[in-house]
């Protein structure tokens, strides 16, 4: 009965949730490295302390099983979960921002396989796809509060807009696990993700700026605004580019569309003649960017992608000057593991920071796999799961 009354209150709160999707705006940060320069003002998402902490984690040693990075933790801070302990088997519910790109599709297959691997411990797994729409996800969470879930996993579509919905779930008495993208509240039992956007953005931007000729022209390609992990990737890249005095001639949103990406790159080639570097806040359309240079008869400049196999193959075949910071899809296993530990009353880390490996020229060969589809991600952490490799093909 307590959960039912709390859920009713939560529904009322959800009805008051704002309708706007997050939009990044410039804002003061109080930090010298956040000041505007050639790349404009820093994003409202930039937090100097978080930036410093993530860069420090790049050199940290994780705790946990050496062969299971999805169970490892960087600098763990354990929290008590005894109040959520209950007997199983359990009903675990998942409110998913979207399945609208290969990264999320590979990740969700990995999560489904983890559910299967847990066998009799999970009685029912409920997945709701918000289709990249804030208001649908708010309604989805509202609906799940009345479905008898034992734990709720949320990958929020955007940060600020989904925060009240997550807070409502917490107030309903559910143990909430947030992963991948964050929210502006501390109420979830744990927030799971790899090192994060600052680390990703920094690694790619440092490499590209160091490999470019001094004062060269750089094109930054972003997916969409308002998502914390993407905003912080750009925030960290901006710091690196400003420090290196890189001439950032454009910052464009691709919507994750290969055709739009190729058109943007071609437009900049036509406008400037030469582009000396390309930085991307995600690698899903990296091959499209490479192809735009090839189609124009231009050398491919230093570029960062991600661990998507099509990019790794092009990198190897064309001998690109490249790097692949990653946001590993193995993180999709961790929320299931965390939810079960919480329901067992075991302590978990909050935040639960996972390792975030980088693919370089030196280790590229170990991640290539010609037997898997081009849109598969090398960091899936899925080779020991039921249905591998067929489930991911």
Provide a role label for each language-model segment:
Residues 1-11:
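N-terminal export and membrane-targeting signals
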Residues 13-18:
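C-terminal motif of bacterial Sec signal peptides marking the signal peptidase cleavage site
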Residues 19-393:
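A residue-level marker of the well-folded mature domains of exported/periplasmic proteins
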């Amino acid at each position: 009965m307590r959960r039912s009354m709390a859920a009713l209150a939560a529904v009322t709160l959800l009805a008051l949730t704002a309708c706007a999707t997050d939009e990044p705006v410039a804002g003061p940060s109080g930090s010298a490295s956040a000041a505007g320069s050639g790349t404009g003002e820093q994003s409202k998402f930039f937090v100097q302390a978080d930036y410093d902490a993530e860069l420090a984690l790049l050199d940290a040693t994780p705790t946990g099983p050496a062969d299971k990075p999805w169970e490892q933790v960087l600098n763990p801070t354990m929290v008590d979960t005894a109040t959520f302990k209950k007997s199983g088997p359990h009903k675990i519910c998942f409110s998913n921002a979207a399945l609208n790109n290969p990264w999320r599709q590979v990740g969700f297959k990995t999560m489904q396989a983890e559910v299967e691997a847990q066998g009799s411990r999970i009685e029912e797994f409920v997945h709701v796809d918000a289709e990249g729409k804030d208001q649908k996800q708010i309604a989805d969470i509202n609906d799940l509060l009345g479905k008898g879930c034992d734990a709720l996993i949320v990958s929020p579509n955007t940060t600020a807009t989904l925060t009240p919905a997550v807070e409502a779930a917490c107030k309903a008495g559910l143990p909430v696990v947030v992963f991948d993208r964050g929210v502006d509240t501390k109420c979830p039992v744990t927030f799971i993700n790899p090192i994060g956007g600052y680390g990703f953005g920094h690694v790619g931007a440092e490499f590209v700026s160091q490999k470019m000729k001094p004062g060269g022209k750089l094109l930054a390609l972003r997916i969409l605004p308002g998502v914390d992990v993407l905003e912080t990737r750009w925030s960290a890249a901006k710091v690196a580019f400003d420090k290196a005095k890189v001439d950032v001639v454009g910052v464009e949103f691709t919507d994750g569309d290969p055709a739009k990406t190729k058109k943007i790159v071609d437009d900049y080639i036509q406008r400037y003649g030469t582009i000396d570097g390309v930085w991307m806040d995600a690698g899903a359309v990296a091959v499209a960017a490479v192809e735009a240079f090839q189609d124009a008869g231009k050398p491919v400049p230093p570029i960062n992608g991600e661990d998507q196999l099509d990019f790794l193959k092009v990198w190897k075949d064309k001998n690109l000057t490249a790097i692949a910071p990653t946001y590993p899809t193995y993180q999709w296993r961790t929320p299931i593991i965390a939810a079960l530990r919480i329901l067992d009353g075991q302590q978990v880390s909050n935040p639960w920071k996972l390792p975030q490996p980088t693919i370089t020229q030196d280790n590229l060969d170990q991640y290539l796999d010609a037997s898997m589809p081009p849109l598969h991600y090398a960091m899936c952490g899925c080779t020991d799961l039921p249905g591998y490799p067929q489930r991911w093909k």
